[in-house]
Amino acid sequence: MSTGLAYPPRLADGVELLGELKDSGFTKPPALIRRADGQMIQISRLLYLVACRIDGTRALDAIAALVSGDLGRSLSASQVSYVITDKLAPLGLLAGGAAKAALPTASPLLALRARATLLPAAAANVAGALFRPLFHWPVIAAVITAGGIMDYWLFMLHGLSGAYRQVLGDPVDLLLVAALSVVSAVFHECGHAAGCRYGGARPGRIGVGIYLVWPSFFTDVTDSYRLGRAGRLRTDLGGVYFNLIFMLGLAACYAVTANQVLLLTIAITHLEMLEQLLPFVRFDGYFILSDLVGVPDLFARIGPVLGTAFARGRHTRGEMLRRPARRMITAWVLCVIPLLAFTLGSLLLYLPAFNRSLWLSVNNAGHLVAGDIAGRQYAAAALAAIGGALAALSSAGSVYVAVRLTRRAAGLVSRRTAGQPRRRLIAVLGAIVCAASLVLFWAVHGQFRGW
């Protein structure tokens, strides 16, 4: 045993053993462990069995004997020592070790950044418990039926022309639509928390962060991985389900007040629901697809799936998936790679022009705010300020995405060329050529003008 680890070995404080991933799309389902910092870790069955037998009192020989019985094959004390010191300890799962060593954490592609908490885990649990009865099947059936009736009346009988005329002519109404949309988004997150709680898991905090270039709300529902497929899908769909409930509440308010602003908010919420169901970025649709196939992080499977396609008989990580899951993920990869390549490629190619337009919008918003305040048009000033803030945030987000992509590419090249100076030199020269070509493209297309 390493002298830095506690002996007899024991798990670090706050480590939870969650068991095997249920309804997994892997040929050999991984086991799940959650650290005290909330990081969810997938490990093999062998590592999980060793972790289960570590209790702070057993010596290596005793652990080896118990794990051997669990596995049905012999495991020596030295092999257990290797698993503990070389596999479990680096993941931060054992007490002792380097006291202040940075724990490894996931850094998924296109993840939410700059997170801030709106509701702590305790409050999110209370909200989940409060709204939990809304997931009883009779309630779900009633909500969906009422939603269908509402949509038929709104889009087929009543229409939205009156709502557009009222809202576009009054900045106060526009502000009200924006405020109601924010409330709808927060209620959406309560739906995820309630779905998680209904299945028997514990939701974490509800907060807000930056996704790509725009602000986005989130709910920590990592504990739902202890649930089966149905429980995880309930958690995923809880957000759009609560959007539907929110729209029914707005329709009821319209029946009392006849305020057209409420109808336009209902229409906008429909668009938000459709956006959430897109499976190509980390919206609800992405997690729905992920839980349908039983693979937690689809973006992490892009490389293995491509490796399987071009392996020419070699064993790859893509073969760890069951055939139905592999087929579904392959179809998803074939759709998402061109979309992301086009989107992120366009961002890089037109980054200066994009940011110049955004900062012109920020500047114009500043003038509008000053003029509206001088004219005592405070609602219009608030709208202009919100628009300017969103433009500035989009600019900062676009630069952040570009920098992050560059850093990930540099890290990948560094790892692939480690110990190979010739290949690294070629990679560096290639990077210089690409950077110079990009700057030349910007210059030729006049993207530096006006700065």
Region locations from a protein language model:
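Core alpha-helical transmembrane segments of integral membrane proteins
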Residues: 106-208, 249-252
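Long, low-complexity, charged/polar intrinsically disordered regions in eukaryotic proteins
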Residues: 1-35
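Alpha-helical transmembrane segments
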Residues: 148-154, 343-350, 393-410, 437-445
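Long, charge-rich, low-complexity alpha-helical segments
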Residues: 36-131
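Membrane-embedded catalytic scaffold of the fatty acid hydroxylase/desaturase
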Residues: 169-320
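Membrane-interfacial helical/loop segments at transmembrane boundaries in membrane proteins
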Residues: 160-164, 353-378, 450-451
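Internal/C-terminal transmembrane anchor helices
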Residues: 417-447
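Cytosolic-side transmembrane helix boundary signature
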Residues: 398-429
